[in-house]
Design a protein with these regions (language model features):
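Extracellular adhesion/glycan-binding regions together with long Ser/Thr-
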Residues: 224-229
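Divalent cation-coordinating acidic motifs and surrounding scaffolds
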Residues: 1-222, 233-237, 241-250
């Protein structure tokens, strides 16, 4: 966990670069309530996020129990309706329109009580589209782990099944790997296809009702409006694209 914390800046910077609207919680205790009674989101200042993360990992509520090596059971507890309901500890964390990324960290095999695929299918059932669930993990690689860790069996299979990122816990530097995990944990809309062929100079793009004259371009080949990396709309934004159709006399 110390190595993850030390490289967490790479994770946050990657999310910020695409204006991701994220919630990041850390579940350590058996009840699944997020450590510190809070989660990270883009409204918090960067320095505050690092302080909150430290409290999540090392604070008084970060008390491991029977689920220490049972990531699937921890995920199940955290996302249990008992914890997600009104007034409950993780209320508001799970969102219908957001990708659900579940990240396990361990130097042992996963010892959850059930079979890994049953857990994957359960978490996929929480979303309208099963593809909106992805597992990532930091642990011992197959087939026999590495110098300081056993093979992270169960979690490795869940990562492979959902197309996530698996990082060897024996890697000396997690920064690049955490960047990859961040990129694989968000749905980024860079391009918006148009239903008709426009006269390019008539295209008007509005984000939350405000006309944006820069930060995007029209791709003739794909017939899409494509946003540049530093101008990607924040998650949940309203995007409106107006244009005159080729051959339209009106």
């Amino acid at each position: 966990l110390a190595a993850v914390e030390g490289n967490f800046a790479s994770f946050l910077n990657s999310l910020s670069s695409v204006n991701a609207d994220y919630n990041i919680g850390v579940a350590i205790a058996d009840d699944g309530c997020f450590s510190g009674g809070v989660w990270l989101d883009p409204t918090q200042a960067y320095i505050d996020q690092l302080l909150i993360l430290n409290e999540m990992i090392y604070g008084v509520t970060a008390f491991p129990g029977n689920y220490t090596e049972r990531a699937f059971n921890l995920f199940e507890s955290a996302l249990n309706p008992v914890n997600l309901g009104a007034g409950d500890c993780n209320e508001g964390f799970l969102r219908d329109d957001a990708l659900l990324a579940l990240i396990g960290v361990s130097d042992e095999d996963d010892q959850s009580y059930g079979y890994w695929l049953d857990y994957v299918l359960y978490f996929q059932s929480l979303k309208v589209d099963p593809a909106d669930v992805v597992f990532h993990a930091i642990g011992g690689p197959p087939p026999s782990g590495c110098d300081m860790a056993l093979y992270y069996s169960g979690m490795y299979e869940a990562v492979a099944w959902t197309g996530g990122q698996f990082i060897s816990i024996c890697e000396p530097d997690y920064s690049a790997a955490l960047t990859s995990i961040a990129e694989g944990s968000v749905n980024v809309m860079l391009a918006f296809p148009l239903s008709d062929t426009p006269i390019p100079e008539t295209i008007v793009v509005r984000i939350n009702g405000v006309v944006e004259k820069s930060g995007w371009n029209y791709d003739y080949n794909s017939n899409e409006v494509v946003f540049q990396t530093n101008y990607i709309p924040v998650g949940g934004s309203s995007i409106e694209i107006e244009y005159t159709i080729t051959g339209d006399c009106n």
